[in-house]
């Protein structure tokens, strides 16, 4: 059964899971809130604090590099990408959004590890502020659900 508002299942159990989080520092006021909401939800779902590894990188383009290092260690049941890209006046927004997203997806497929992508992309700061908590919670829920699903399928 899926939640009425979101695509994640209602009952999730993270008790046995090891989760890696990579957080971009760029737009740190937003990404810190994303990370806090994500961590709180992981703990609420039963993931043990000692089984959560959280690292920081400069920006969204560096997130896939750290995710790859974590995926190569084969210690994590799921990974989470956290970042915030706000549109500016140049093409840089599209470049960073597209490349970071493609990198995250490629890693999930190449390493067969679920990666919840919460690198939020918005037109302005107001949109980012409105999404920061919800998207952090969503990322935690997606990571736990997908880790459990892949375990069930293996």
Curated annotation (Swiss-Prot):
| Pathway where this protein functions | Cofactor biosynthesis; riboflavin biosynthesis; riboflavin from 2-hydroxy-3-oxobutyl phosphate and 5-amino-6-(D-ribitylamino)uracil: step 1/2
Active site location? 92
Q: What is its EC number?
A: 2.5.1.78
Disulphide-bridged cysteine pairs: none
Name of the top EC class for this enzyme? transferase
Gene3D superfamilies listed in its UniProt record: Lumazine/riboflavin synthase (3.40.50.960)
Give the family, as the similarity comment puts it.
Belongs to the DMRL synthase family.
- Annotated function: Catalyzes the formation of 6,7-dimethyl-8-ribityllumazine by condensation of 5-amino-6-(D-ribitylamino)uracil with 3,4-dihydroxy-2-butanone 4-phosphate. This is the penultimate step in the biosynthesis of riboflavin.
Provide the protein name.
6,7-dimethyl-8-ribityllumazine synthase
GN (gene name) = ribH
